[in-house]
Amino acid sequence: MSTTREKLLATTTKFVSAFGSFDIEEMLNIRTPTCLYHQCCPSFDKNVVTNEETRASFPQFIATFKRFDFSILEPDHTLVDEAARKVMIRAKTSAESIVGAYENEYIFILKMTDDCRLIEEIHEFYDTIRLKDLQHRLEANRISFGDAAPF
């Protein structure tokens, strides 16, 4: 039988795989139906996103990126709080957008269900300067960035 730590890390691995998959069903299947996604970057006026909002904005994500690679940076620095059922990872993306290369770094805090198999809450922190650069490049090409972009 797996330990709590092993279960938390297994779900985290599924999250990372799903995030880079370009498959909305895979992304949502590891979340509870009531999962809340906190985008913790107030300069973008994004606060809390539901699964339904993620699904609705996903076509814009697919239209913006041709390739989206997502992985954990420094896996040895992953923090696991078994009692709180939380995992914190530092991650990176390397992507090819319709307006050129895009790279960013993130901190994710994932809160899991009691059985550690699903994610019930996500907190995401990212480099807003890099995202603003992408936004400006999209706008310069008259491509709508949108308020509900899931990135």
From Swiss-Prot:
Q: Which GO terms describe its biological process?
A: terpenoid biosynthetic process
Q: Which InterPro entries match?
A: Fungal_Meroterpenoid_Isomerase, NTF2-like_dom_sf
More details: In A.calidoustus, the austinoid gene cluster lies on a contiguous DNA region, while clusters from E.nidulans and P.brasilianum are split in their respective genomes. Genetic rearrangements provoked variability among the clusters and E.nidulans produces the least number of austionoid derivatives with the end products austinol and dehydroaustinol, while P.brasilianum can produce until acetoxydehydroaustin, and A.calidoustus produces the highest number of identified derivatives.
Species the sequence originates in? Penicillium brasilianum
User: What family, per the record?
Assistant: Belongs to the trt14 isomerase family.
Q: Subunit structure, per the record?
A: Homodimer.
Residues annotated as coiled-coil are none
What pathway does the annotation place this protein in? Answer: Secondary metabolite biosynthesis; terpenoid biosynthesis
Q: What does the function comment of this entry state? A: Part of the gene cluster B that mediates the biosynthesis of the fungal meroterpenoid acetoxydehydroaustin. The first step of the pathway is the synthesis of 3,5-dimethylorsellinic acid by the polyketide synthase ausA. 3,5-dimethylorsellinic acid is then prenylated by the polyprenyl transferase ausN. Further epoxidation by the FAD-dependent monooxygenase ausM and cyclization by the probable terpene cyclase ausL lead to the formation of protoaustinoid A.
Signal sequence span is: none
**Protein name per its UniProtKB record:** Austinoid biosynthesis clusters protein F
